[in-house]
């Protein structure tokens, strides 16, 4: 395995270094070829490294940063005031070639804007998209994008997302000839926004995309598609709704019957069912798929959930490792060139319209 260096914005997220630094140590234990640059306030980071052994410390470096971008800051304001912030410094390390990827749990809008400013989109990509890999009931995985980087998307962007998602499904998830679908309010051709229907028409003409049509939100976890494409507003709401339902379900499994008097055999049956069902559905736990890749840039950027715990942030670090190892940006660029050798104009500016 090739040695990798990642830059971590350890100050970002709801819990900052108290979660990100222990997660960094966990990631180092799991990968002997990994070096981590911890970007943030040294006074906040150093005490949390007390339990790190000599070998771990040899693969850690603290990169000082003067400030933190607030989670509630407007993206435009955050970008203007970003110099010296932990997020910007981490991204600059990628731009300078000192790190191969950046991981942050900070402000999504600021991360999107700064990454686009510093790392630049690939040729043929208008705007990057946030993408994650979700488990489904068939024990497989589905690539979903956009998850919030772009609230409003025209048809051209949706087609670009489909191309990028298809590459990620092939190269990282290792799904041959992945099926691609557009998230819509129905499966009929006439349903949905103009942007969705226009994107559908274009995807049907691209031989390298295994486009299967529309998919409704209630089929997200069924395994009917390998790549699901949507605008960022829809994707973000869909993802958070799904996460909330899964967390509620797992919580109910653990708490069912608490505080009630039951016979000993009912208690044994309850415990057996809890363990069995928890094992059966543990792959749906949101902590196990934390980390959305900002796809479409000339570098690798992973956005962790702001409320991620130690385990979840360590998963986001692993997502960055996989993206770098599989050379995702380079492979997307190659796919775009093969699909559109004469240029990258896909549509004549198709805009989102009204529902039908």
Curated annotation (Swiss-Prot):
Superkingdom, taxonomy of origin: Bacteria
Gene Ontology terms for molecular function: phosphate:acyl-[acyl carrier protein] acyltransferase activity
GO biological process: fatty acid biosynthetic process; phospholipid biosynthetic process
InterPro entries: FA_synthesis, Phospholipid_synth_PlsX-like
UniProt pathway annotation: Lipid metabolism; phospholipid metabolism
Listed SUPFAM superfamilies: Isocitrate/Isopropylmalate dehydrogenase-like (SSF53659)
GO annotations of cellular component type: cytoplasm
Keywords tagged on the record: Cytoplasm, Lipid biosynthesis, Lipid metabolism, Phospholipid biosynthesis, Phospholipid metabolism, Transferase
Pfam families: FA_synthesis
E.C. no: 2.3.1.274
Catalytic activity, as annotated: a fatty acyl-[ACP] + phosphate = an acyl phosphate + holo-[ACP]
Subcellular location: Cytoplasm
UniProt-listed PANTHER family: FATTY ACID/PHOSPHOLIPID SYNTHESIS PROTEIN PLSX, PHOSPHATE ACYLTRANSFERASE
Subunit structure: Homodimer. Probably interacts with PlsY.
Its biological purpose: Catalyzes the reversible formation of acyl-phosphate (acyl-PO(4)) from acyl-[acyl-carrier-protein] (acyl-ACP). This enzyme utilizes acyl-ACP as fatty acyl donor, but not acyl-CoA.
Entry's family note: Belongs to the PlsX family.
Alphabetical list of HAMAP family matching this protein: PlsX (MF_00019)
Entry-linked NCBIfam families: plsX (TIGR00182)
Protein name per UniProt: Phosphate acyltransferase
Gene expressing this chain: plsX
């Amino acid at each position: 395995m090739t040695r990798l260096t990642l830059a971590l914005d350890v100050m970002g997220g709801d819990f900052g270094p108290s979660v990100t630094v222990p997660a960094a140590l966990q990631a180092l234990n799991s990968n002997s070829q990994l070096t981590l640059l911890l970007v943030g306030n040294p006074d906040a980071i150093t005490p949390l490294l007390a339990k790190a052994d000599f070998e771990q410390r040899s693969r850690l470096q603290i990169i000082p940063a003067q400030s933190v971008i607030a989670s509630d800051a407007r993206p435009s304001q955050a970008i203007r005031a970003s110099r010296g912030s932990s997020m910007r410094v981490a991204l600059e390390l990628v731009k300078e070639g000192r790190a191969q990827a950046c991981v942050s749990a900070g402000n999504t809008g600021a991360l999107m804007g700064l990454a686009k400013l510093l790392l630049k989109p690939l040729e043929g990509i208008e705007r990057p998209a946030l993408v994650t890999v979700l488990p489904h009931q068939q024990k497989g995985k589905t690539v979903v994008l956009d998850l919030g980087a772009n609230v409003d998307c025209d048809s051209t962007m949706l087609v670009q997302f489909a191309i990028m998602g298809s590459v990620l499904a092939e190269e990282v998830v290792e799904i041959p000839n992945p099926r691609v679908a557009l998230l819509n309010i129905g499966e009929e051709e006439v349903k949905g926004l103009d942007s969705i229907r226009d994107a559908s028409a274009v995807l049907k003409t691209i031989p390298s995309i295994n486009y299967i049509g529309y998919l409704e939100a209630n089929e997200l976890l069924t395994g009917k598609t390998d790549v699901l494409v949507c605008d960022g507003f829809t994707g973000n709401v869909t993802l958070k709704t799904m996460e909330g339902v899964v967390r509620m379900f797992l919580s109910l499994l653990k708490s069912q019957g608490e505080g009630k008097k039951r016979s000993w055999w009912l208690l044994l049956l309850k415990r057996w069912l809890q363990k069995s069902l928890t094992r059966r559905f543990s792959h749906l736990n949101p902590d196990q798929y934390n980390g959305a890749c900002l796809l479409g840039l000339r570098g690798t950027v992973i956005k962790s959930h702001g409320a991620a715990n130690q385990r979840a942030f360590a998963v986001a670090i692993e997502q960055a490792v996989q993206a770098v190892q599989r050379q995702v940006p380079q492979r997307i660029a190659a796919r775009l060139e093969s699909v559109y050798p004469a240029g990258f104009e896909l549509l004549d500016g198709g805009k989102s319209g009204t529902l039908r």
